[in-house]
UniProtKB/Swiss-Prot annotation:
Allows the formation of correctly charged Asn-tRNA(Asn) or Gln-tRNA(Gln) through the transamidation of misacylated Asp-tRNA(Asn) or Glu-tRNA(Gln) in organisms which lack either or both of asparaginyl-tRNA or glutaminyl-tRNA synthetases. The reaction takes place in the presence of glutamine and ATP through an activated phospho-Asp-tRNA(Asn) or phospho-Glu-tRNA(Gln). This is Aspartyl/glutamyl-tRNA(Asn/Gln) amidotransferase subunit C. GO terms for biological process: glutaminyl-tRNAGln biosynthesis via transamidation; regulation of translational fidelity; translation. Belongs to the GatC family. Keywords: ATP-binding, Ligase, Nucleotide-binding, Protein biosynthesis. It holds the Pfam family GatC. It catalyses: L-glutamyl-tRNA(Gln) + L-glutamine + ATP + H2O = L-glutaminyl-tRNA(Gln) + L-glutamate + ADP + phosphate + H(+); L-aspartyl-tRNA(Asn) + L-glutamine + ATP + H2O = L-asparaginyl-tRNA(Asn) + L-glutamate + ADP + phosphate + 2 H(+). One of its GO terms (molecular function) is glutaminyl-tRNA synthase (glutamine-hydrolyzing) activity. Its EC number is 6.3.5.-. Heterotrimer of A, B and C subunits. It comes from the Bacteria. It comes from Rippkaea orientalis (strain PCC 8801 / RF-1) (Cyanothece sp. (strain PCC 8801)).
Amino acid sequence: MINRQQVEKIAHLARLEITPAEEEAFAPQLNSILQYFDQLSELDTENVPPMTRAIELSNITRSDRTETYGDRESLLKSAPEQEGDFFRVPQIMNNDQE
């Protein structure tokens, strides 16, 4: 059973800022999801072959190819922040280890 403190830890690990009221609201929701997984684990899958996707489609994405863009300056000017000839983006990874 997931409690409020565990929801707080999960939110911290996911880098989410949630209020104590949201922690209280999410605990029963997460417990409901876990109960559903418990139900799924009761299914007999002995004779079900493993699969990686529900339908057999593969390579449905476009091929990667480089393209030139004529107006580099206007592209750089449209960025919220730039540093020299590069876009400056917020840092998404840090070194604190949990």
